[in-house]
């Protein structure tokens, strides 16, 4: 297991984004934490389709609200992702048992929450003219930075070809 909680997606309102986030979590062995209200139902067809056939690999936990999330994940280290963050996501060290929190696609996390955690509010670099990145892309970028720092534990680090073997390259020269 990668950690007790890597990605917390708070109040995600687009079912396709959550499906894509779920697929990223499933493919990386990362637990997905969803905080209500979500704006969709977990059994939504679009949500299931976006996650494709990865649902059996997904470890998912639901929380009634943000207070419920913090109460049940005490002892973890929280990182808050926002376009308003002052620290880059790649400039921090991610400990075991960390949670990456993302807000609504349209509004982000509440500013009051960010003000309580200024040193742990992180930003993905982008040009000034861009409002934000897509939520599921942001989650993937952040999750893979954590996994890179952890040297991709339990993940397959080498792919195999379908019709050839990489070792065949040595025989061709």
Pin down the residues of each PLM region:
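Short, structured coil segments at secondary-structure junctions
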Residues: 7, 28, 50, 74, ...
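Histidine-anchored nucleotide/phosphate-binding helix
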Residues: 18-27
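Structured adenosyl-cofactor binding patch, chiefly the S-adenosyl-L-methionine
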Residues: 116-167
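Single conserved hydrophobic/aromatic residue that forms the stacking wall/gate
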Residues: 1-7
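Hydrophobic/aromatic beta-strand patches that form the interior of the parallel beta-sheet core
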Residues: 33, 61, 79, 120-122
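Active-site loops and adjacent core secondary-structure elements that bind or stabilize anionic groups
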Residues: 11-12
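S-adenosyl-L-methionine/SAH cofactor-binding core of RNA-modifying enzymes
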Residues: 44-111
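Short internal beta-strands
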Residues: 31-37
């Amino acid at each position: 297991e990668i950690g007790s909680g890597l990605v917390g997606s708070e109040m995600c309102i687009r079912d396709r984004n959550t499906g894509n986030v779920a697929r990223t979590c499933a493919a990386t062995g990362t637990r997905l934490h969803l905080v209500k209200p979500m704006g969709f139902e977990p059994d939504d067809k679009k949500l299931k389709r976006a996650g494709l056939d990865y649902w059996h690999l997904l470890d998912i936990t639901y929380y009634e609200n943000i207070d419920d999330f913090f109460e049940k994940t005490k002892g973890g280290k929280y990182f808050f992702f926002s376009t308003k963050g002052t620290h880059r996501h790649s400039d921090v060290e991610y400990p075991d048992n960390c949670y990456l929190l993302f807000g609504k696609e349209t509004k982000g996390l509440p500013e009051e929450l960010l003000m309580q955690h200024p040193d742990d509010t992180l930003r993905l670099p982008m040009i000034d003219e861009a409002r934000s990145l897509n939520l599921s892309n942001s989650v993937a970028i952040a999750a893979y930075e954590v996994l890179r720092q952890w040297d991709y534990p339990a993940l397959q680090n080498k792919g195999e070809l379908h019709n050839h073997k990489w070792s065949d390259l040595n025989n061709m020269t």
